[in-house]
């Protein structure tokens, strides 16, 4: 991971890395039924976090900001906390700040309150705290429960607007939710040189996005932000973390004649070592039943969105024709959904021998 300083002289700027939404020990159970998938992805979370810490160490970055949802409070294991803390020990000269989020609030019994973190770690609570250094003033606050609606940002007074100032918190910039709703306009009005925020897993001007993708709704590259701040002049860049990505593709089954052909087609897909979700589309006249054990490992989810092929003339008075006609009437009246229609149609025609 190579970088070039944006400013000419070191004394002109302060440097930081901003990480958000790691979600250590998240279950991943809704993504794939494969027993080993969750453990594999949790190992990737560890590798991704280590890449970020190695970057900090290699480039002697002075500040590390972790803007909440570092871990999943419901599932977190002490061994994972030990892993995190041991990595922090590798960067003793870096000042580390954590603003707990709605998934890892600083509750009475949390690891944030009941663990011997290394000395260079500061963990914010729900009250805004200001910490002053020669090169920057840092204002931070975080969750102490699974909800926060106190609008604490409005009450922050930036005392020295001529100095580098940074806000660290976990919150929602785009919706008036129970997860610390905050305003981009207020952030700008306060005069912060940088706002280290997390909560939204998609990267944009404020959010770094999740460090490692957590599912098919988070496609593309993931990583963290490296930044340099000098008297309100901000330079930043996205640093990609090497990981398997989540990819969604469609497979048209219209030209296929059997379930076995579908399985063969799935096994020919070049997954490039990424995780794939496949949508089966098109029209078919055979029943689909995919045994996940028969397809390549990196295809972790297959959804059948194909439709059963129906060839029916208006004067078809057979049991088959009457069945389809009645089913069509239920669909048109809104009594059943398209998905339900397709399922009943397939089961019915299979029973009738098509």
Give the predicted meaning of each segment.
Residues 58-60, 160-161, 269-271:
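Glycine-rich phosphate-binding loop signature in dinucleotide/nucleotide-binding domains
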Residues 60, 137, 191, 272-274, ...:
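Short loop/turn motifs at secondary-structure junctions
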Residues 63, 72-223:
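His/Asp/Glu-rich metal-coordinating catalytic cores
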Residues 37-43, 135-145, 244-257:
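Acidic/glycine-enriched edge-of-secondary-structure segments
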Residues 198-256:
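A conserved active-site cap/scaffold subdomain adjacent to cofactor or substrate pockets
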Residues 234-354:
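Accessory, non-catalytic peripheral segments of nucleic-acid enzymes
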Residues 3-81, 347, 354:
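N-terminal active-site segment of His-dependent metallophosphoesterases
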């Amino acid at each position: 991971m190579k970088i070039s300083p944006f400013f000419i002289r070191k004394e002109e700027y302060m440097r930081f890395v901003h990480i958000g939404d790691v979600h250590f020990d998240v279950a991943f159970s809704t993504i794939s039924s494969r027993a080993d998938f969750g453990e594999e992805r949790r190992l990737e979370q560890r590798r991704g976090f280590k890449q970020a810490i190695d970057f900090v160490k290699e480039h002697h970055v002075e500040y590390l900001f972790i803007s909440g949802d570092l871990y999943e409070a419901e599932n977190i294991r002490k061994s994972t906390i030990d892993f995190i803390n041991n990595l922090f020990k590798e960067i003793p000269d870096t000042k580390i700040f954590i603003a707990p989020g709605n998934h890892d609030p600083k509750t009475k019994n949390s690891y944030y309150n009941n663990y011997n973190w290394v000395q260079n770690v500061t963990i914010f609570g729900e009250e805004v705290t200001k910490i002053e250094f020669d090169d920057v003033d840092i204002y931070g606050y975080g969750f102490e429960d699974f909800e926060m609606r106190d609008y604490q940002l409005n009450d922050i007074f930036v005392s020295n607007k001529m100095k580098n100032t940074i806000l660290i918190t976990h919150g929602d910039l785009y919706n008036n939710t129970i997860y610390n709703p905050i305003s981009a306009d207020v952030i700008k009005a306060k005069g912060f040189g940088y706002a280290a925020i997390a909560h939204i897993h998609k990267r944009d001007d404020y959010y770094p996005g999740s460090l490692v993708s957590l599912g098919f709704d988070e496609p593309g590259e993931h990583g963290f932000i490296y930044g340099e701040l000098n008297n309100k002049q901000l330079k930043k860049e996205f640093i990609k973390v090497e990981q398997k990505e989540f990819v969604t593709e469609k497979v048209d089954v219209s030209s296929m004649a059997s379930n076995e052909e579908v399985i063969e087609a799935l096994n020919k897909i070049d997954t490039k070592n990424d995780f794939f979700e496949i949508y089966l589309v098109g029209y078919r006249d055979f029943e689909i039943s995919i045994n996940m054990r028969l397809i390549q490992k990196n295809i972790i989810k297959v959804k059948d969105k194909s439709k059963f092929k129906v060839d029916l003339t208006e004067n078809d008075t057979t049991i088959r024709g009457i069945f389809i006609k009645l089913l069509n009437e239920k669909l048109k009246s809104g009594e059943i959904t398209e998905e339900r229609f397709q399922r009943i149609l397939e089961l019915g025609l299979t029973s009738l021998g098509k």
